[in-house]
């Protein structure tokens, strides 16, 4: 096992060691990327100043041991070791996930350092940052393809852009942090790379091979654990100043809202990575338009009642004293007189409704005798009862006979005979 090899994380405890992919130096072949206990790489023998490193590998532990037990069994002491690209140009590669091409697997990992020879990285040790002329000794591998981390945005790797990296046992910040600035360095020149590594432009968004897809605050933690015990985890800290970046590389810090931070870098599987879309909606803050003015009142129309009444043939006195019409009184009287004449012609002469008591008594009457009765009428039409002996009957000028009480009452209200409708008052005068 090489001392700088790292293993894929999020493997279940029962996963065999052969399924975990490791990364090696630039001189290793693709077949040597699979970790085996018997292989030794160029990084197996570090520089001469690390003399206290053990020469053989510690005994391998069963793969089913949890990470907490491995951390508990890790040694507490060790000699400090400096990591700098000038002294060690071996690449530092991480296989984030091997199954990313099979589906949208969320990248939720925690970055930890892994050592295979048992020497720790003490807390006080500083890891100097790299400049733009020197590529960092680290890269990320997605499904067998290597991604140089120094070309990615600064929040992805803190060892290349930040000031220092002390190694306390704390949690590593998010892979894509919520810093208030987005670092935009100028595009560096493509450095020479080994044959087994893919070209730099294939993964960096310097070319237009892959579409730029924004990732909005992916809360991802990369956890890199190997078979060997881990002694600490990288932690971003700005408590002490570190080596400054090269003055030839100007850095432009652009202010940006942390809630809407977008980092764009081309990755072949960027469309498979989970992204948290911003659901904040902006509402247009504009004052509401003033309400429309009320409609104007309808125009005043004078009443048509006086005009309508003036068209009627009526006298102004009948309308009442409140209505005064400018009409000639003589003309009105003449019209009324003519109207009355027309009415009299249609009605005829005015006659009283009934006969007076004197007129009624002038009509002849007699006592009914059945033996001497000569008329064919035997009953009274008013009361519809038969004549009886010794009853008083009244005879009208039309020779119709009735009971005296019945016909007198009828003649007081009517002037005609109840049977033939003849005038009861004319006949006697003509007879006289």
Curated annotation (Swiss-Prot):
Domain of life of the source: Eukaryota
Gene Ontology MF annotations: ubiquitin protein ligase activity; zinc ion binding
UniProt xrefs under PROSITE patterns: ZF_RING_2
Keyword hit for Zinc-finger: yes
SMART domains named among the record's database cross-references: RING
Compositionally biased region (Pro residues): 56-65
InterPro entries documented for this protein: Znf_RING, Znf_RING/FYVE/PHD
ZnF endpoints (RING-type): 380-421
Any Pfam family matching the protein: zf-RING_2
CDD domains: RING-H2_RNF44
Annotated region described as Disordered, given as residue ranges: 1-86
GO terms of biological process kind: protein ubiquitination
Keyword terms of this UniProt record: Metal-binding, Zinc, Zinc-finger
PANTHER family reported in the protein's UniProt record: GH10160P, RING FINGER PROTEIN 44
Protein name (Swiss-Prot/TrEMBL): RING finger protein 44
Source species of the chain: Homo sapiens
């Amino acid at each position: 096992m090489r001392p700088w090899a790292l293993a894929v994380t999020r493997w279940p405890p029962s996963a065999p060691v052969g399924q975990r992919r490791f990364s090696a130096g630039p001189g290793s072949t693709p077949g040597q990327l699979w970790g085996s206990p018997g292989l030794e790489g160029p990084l197996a023998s570090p520089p001469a100043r690390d003399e206290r490193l053990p020469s053989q590998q510690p005994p391998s532990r069963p793969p089913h041991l949890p990470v907490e037990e491995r951390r508990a069994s890790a040694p507490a002491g060790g000699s400090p070791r400096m990591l700098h690209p000038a002294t060690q140009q071996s690449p530092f590669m991480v296989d984030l996930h091997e199954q990313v091409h099979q589906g949208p697997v969320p990248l939720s990992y925690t970055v930890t350092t892994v050592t295979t020879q048992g020497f720790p990285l003490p807390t006080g040790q500083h890891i100097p940052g790299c400049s733009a002329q020197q590529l960092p000794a680290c890269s990320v591998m997605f499904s067998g393809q290597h991604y140089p981390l120094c070309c990615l945005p600064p929040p992805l790797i803190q060892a290349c852009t930040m000031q220092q990296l002390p190694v306390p046992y704390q949690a590593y910040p998010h892979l894509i942090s919520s810093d208030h600035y987005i670092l935009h360095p100028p595009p560096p020149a493509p450095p020479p790379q080994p044959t087994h590594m893919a070209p730099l432009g294939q993964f960096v968004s310097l070319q237009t091979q892959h579409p730029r897809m924004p990732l909005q605050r992916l809360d991802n933690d990369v956890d890199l654990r190997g078979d060997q015990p881990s002694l600490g985890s990288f932690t971003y800290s700005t408590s002490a100043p570190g080596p400054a970046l090269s003055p030839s590389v100007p850095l432009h810090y652009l202010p940006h809202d942390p809630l809407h931070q977008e980092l764009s870098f081309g990755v072949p599987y960027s469309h498979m990575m989970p992204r948290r879309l911003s659901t904040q909606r902006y509402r247009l803050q504009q004052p509401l338009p003033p309400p429309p003015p009320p409609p104007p009142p309808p125009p005043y129309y004078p009443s048509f009642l006086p005009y309508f009444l003036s068209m009627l043939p009526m006298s102004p006195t009948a309308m009442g004293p409140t209505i005064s019409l400018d009409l000639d009184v003589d003309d009105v009287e003449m019209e009324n007189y003519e109207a009355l004449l027309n009415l009299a012609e249609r009605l005829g002469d005015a006659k009283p409704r009934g006969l007076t008591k004197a007129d009624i008594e002038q009509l002849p009457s007699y006592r009914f005798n059945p033996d001497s009765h000569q008329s064919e009428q035997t009953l009274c039409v008013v009361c519809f009862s038969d004549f009886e002996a010794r009853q008083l009957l009244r005879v009208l000028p039309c020779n119709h006979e009735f009971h005296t009480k019945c016909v007198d009452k009828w003649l007081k209200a009517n002037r005609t005979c109840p049977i033939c409708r003849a005038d009861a008052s004319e006949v006697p005068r003509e007879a006289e």
